Amino acid sequence: MRLIPLSTAQQVGKWSANYIVEKINAFAPSADRPFVLGLPTGGTPLATYKALIELHRAGKVSFQHVVTFNMDEYVGIPADHPQSYRTFMYENFFNHIDIKDENINLLNGNATDPQAECARYEAKIKSYGKINLFMGGVGNDGHIAFNEPASSLASRTRMKTLTEDTRLANSRFFDNDINKVPKYALTVGVGTLLDAEELMILATGINKAQAVQVATEGAVNHLWTISCVQLHPKAILVCDDPATMELRVKTLRYFQQIEAQERQQYQD
C-alpha cells in the first residue's frame, strides 16, 4: 500500500486530480479502448473534482473516451432530488467536462427490482473488463461507498441498510433531519472495489484519523471496511495532516521518506 501524506485537503484534491490525469493520459484512451474510472460522492472528493475541472479547462485532459461508474446511490429519492448522487455528480463534475453522457454509469435507486439493477451494474462493469482506477472516500467508521461495518470483503454491488451513524453524518445534507435521510442505498461491493486495477482512497480531517490508522497499522477486519486496502496490490491512501494524527510517528515518517525518495527520483 502507498500512503501519500500531505498537509491540507486542498493538496489532497490537487494531488489526486493530477494522478487521475496522469493515468488517463498515459493510457491514451480511444472510443474502442476507454479508460474506466470509478467515482465517489461526498465532501472529500469535491476538491478533486474542482481540480479536475481546472485541468480539463486548461487543456491538460479530455474525458471524451473516459467511462465512469459511480459508487452508490440512495434508494427511494427521485433522480433529480437535490441530494441524489446523480444530481451531485452532474452539478459538481459532469456538467463541467467533455464526458459523453452515454459513458456515465450511475445506479438507479428507483429501480423496481433493486437486485436486478445491482446485477446489471456488475455486468456493465465486467463488460469493460475492469475499472482502471477507482477513487473513493472513507467514512468516520471506515466505510467505503455504503459498505458499512461488517460488510463482506467479497461483497458485490447490492442494496444495503444504512447505519444510524451514517444517516446522522449525512443528515447535514437533509436539513439536519435524520428522518429525511434514506434508510437504504445501492452500493458497489468491497469485492467490486478490489477488482479495480488501482484503488485510491482519499481521507481528510481529524475525524478520519482512526480509519487511516486502522487501514495502515491494523489488521484486515470486516468491521473496518477501509482495511481492505491491504488486500489490494495497487492501493493508494491520500491523506491530509489531520487524517494522519493517529498514526505512529515511525509509521508516518516511513511513508514521508518513501514519497520524498519518489519525488527525488522523478526530478532526477
Swiss-Prot record:
Which pathway does the database say it acts in?
Answer: Amino-sugar metabolism; N-acetylneuraminate degradation; D-fructose 6-phosphate from N-acetylneuraminate: step 5/5
Q: Which UniProt keywords apply?
A: Allosteric enzyme, Carbohydrate metabolism, Hydrolase
Instruction: Quickly give the catalysed reaction.
Output: alpha-D-glucosamine 6-phosphate + H2O = beta-D-fructose 6-phosphate + NH4(+)
Enzyme nomenclature, EC number: 3.5.99.6
Pfam families hit by this protein: Glucosamine_iso (PF01182)
Give the InterPro entries listed for this entry: Glc/Gal-6P_isomerase (IPR006148), Glucosamine6P_isomerase (IPR004547), Glucosamine6P_isomerase_CS (IPR018321), NagB/RpiA_transferase-like (IPR037171)
Superkingdom assignment: Bacteria
State the Gene Ontology terms under molecular function: glucosamine-6-phosphate deaminase activity; identical protein binding
One GO biological process term is:
N-acetylneuraminate catabolic process
> What residues make up the catalytic site?
72 (proton acceptor), 141 (for ring-opening step), 143 (proton acceptor), 148 (for ring-opening step)
Q: Where are the transmembrane segments?
A: none
Q: Name one GO cellular component term.
A: cytoplasm
UniProt-annotated site: Part of the allosteric site, residues: 151, 158, 160-161, 254
Regulation (activators, inhibitors): Allosterically activated by N-acetylglucosamine 6-phosphate (GlcNAc6P).
Q: Which family does it belong to?
A: Belongs to the glucosamine/galactosamine-6-phosphate isomerase family. NagB subfamily.
| NCBIfam families in UniProt | nagB (TIGR00502)
Subunit details? Homohexamer.
Q: What does this protein do?
A: Catalyzes the reversible isomerization-deamination of glucosamine 6-phosphate (GlcN6P) to form fructose 6-phosphate (Fru6P) and ammonium ion.
Q: What is this protein called?
A: Glucosamine-6-phosphate deaminase
The record lists the organism as Proteus mirabilis (strain HI4320)
| Name of the gene | nagB
